[in-house]
Design a protein with these regions (language model features):
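Outer-membrane beta-barrel "beta-signal"
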Residues: 150, 292, 314-326
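Membrane-embedded beta-strands of outer-membrane beta-barrel proteins
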Residues: 52-54, 95-97, 148-150, 188, ...
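Outer membrane beta-barrel
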Residues: 16-29, 35-170, 191-196, 261, ...
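Cleavable N-terminal export/targeting peptides
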Residues: 1-13
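Outer-membrane beta-barrel domain signature
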Residues: 40-44, 81-85, 135-141, 173-179, ...
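C-terminal hydrophobic structural anchor segments
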Residues: 258-301, 308
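Detector for outer-membrane/organellar transmembrane beta-barrel domains
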Residues: 16-18, 22, 64, 181, ...
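Residues that define the transmembrane beta-barrel architecture of outer-membrane proteins
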Residues: 45-50, 88-93, 142-146, 182-186, ...
Length: 326
């Protein structure tokens, strides 16, 4: 016998976390939402509605797919005796067209997530284990690019080599005023399954940013993820070099472990190091957390982080959050 939830899914064609295809159309809707309760060191408790994100997929032709992600960021902040939406911003995260030539060759044009490492490509709150994000996954480079990309899987290379090659000449589609976007950029990311449980990747990017024109930066990164039986270990390391010299260079990395505790409860631990340009020494961040993953679409996270040599005001303290994938 079907449960009420299963029956509803059968009636509407919708299942939580899988998106909803509009009947009699080629349009699919999805998205996610995330909210957090934070107690950052030295500040009062804060309740934030962090993200309300809408995904739209449209496939008018067999080979052509259009995709957009629009996100309402920080739509509501509640503190002691104060409620505000002053920080609300409607961001265009992604807007692109994909043309599928074959498994080995596809083309993308528009605004997309910069293919550096793994975290940036799967950063949606319901898909990651922690509320906070490692600094190396967003500080050294713009997380979005507007331009063109060729990507695919080369099945002739061992178990299959995934690749992305991209370029940007700036002119960001709806640039986020909080970010220093690309002026010019090109780069690549390669990912390879060494075995069934281990994926490794390398990244390279050469770029110039809008607010720092004339300064060329080279970013080199490696990433790896091992997962088996509910356990997971992941890491990313990155080095950014600058034409302005060592004082403008950045480097860092993290290693994160996840272990099942029984049922739907998981323990999470992470160590990260990050040295921002001009900052000496780098910051060391330790994190411990507990997650309750109800299913693939709904997760409750709790974590506490502590920093050493925190001269860049990296966030540390307690965070509790809930995230749902539609």
């Amino acid at each position: 016998m079907l449960s009420a939830h299963q029956a509803a899914a059968d009636d509407t064609g919708y299942q939580l976390g899988h998106g909803w295809q509009v009947p009699d159309t080629d349009l699919t809707l999805g998205g996610y939402a995330a909210s957090s309760l934070d107690k950052v060191q030295g500040r009062p408790w804060t309740l934030d509605v962090n993200s309300l994100s809408l995904f739209l997929w449209w496939q008018p032709l067999e080979r052509l797919k259009l995709f957009s992600e629009t996100e309402l960021e920080n739509s509501l902040t509640v503190q002691q005796r104060r409620t505000s939406s002053d920080g609300a911003y409607l961001a265009l995260e992604r807007l692109y067209a994909d043309w599928t030539q074959s498994d080995a060759l596809n083309f993308r044009v528009g605004k997309f997530l910069t293919p550096v490492g793994r975290w940036n490509l799967i950063h949606a709150a319901p898909l990651v284990w922690t509320t906070s994000r490692p600094l190396i996954t967003f500080e050294p480079f713009p997380t979005n690019a507007t331009g063109a990309m060729a990507y695919g899987t080369l099945t002739s290379v061992g178990a299959g080599l995934d690749y992305s090659l991209y370029g940007s000449i700036g002119k960001e589609l709806r640039p986020n005023h909080r970010l220093d976007t690309f002026n010019k950029a090109y780069g690549a990311h390669l990912s390879y399954p060494v075995q069934d449980y281990l994926q490794v990747g390398i990244s390279f990017a050469n770029f110039e940013q809008i607010n720092e024109r004339g300064e060329r930066k080279n970013l080199v990164g490696v990433d790896a993820t091992w997962s088996r039986g509910g356990y997971e270990v992941s890491t990313e390391l990155g080095w950014r070099f600058s034409s302005e010299g060592d004082n403008s260079a950045e480097k860092g990395g993290f290693i994160q472990g996840v272990a099942p505790l029984g049922g739907k409860l998981y323990a999470v631990g992470r160590y990260e190091y990050f040295r921002e340009s001009g900052a000496q020494p780098g910051v060391n961040l330790w994190l411990a957390g507990l997650d309750y993953r109800w299913n693939r679409a709904l997760i409750l996270k709790s974590e506490y982080s502590k920093a050493v040599d925190n001269r860049i005001d990296a966030q540390e303290g307690f965070q509790l959050s809930v995230a749902v994938l539609f």
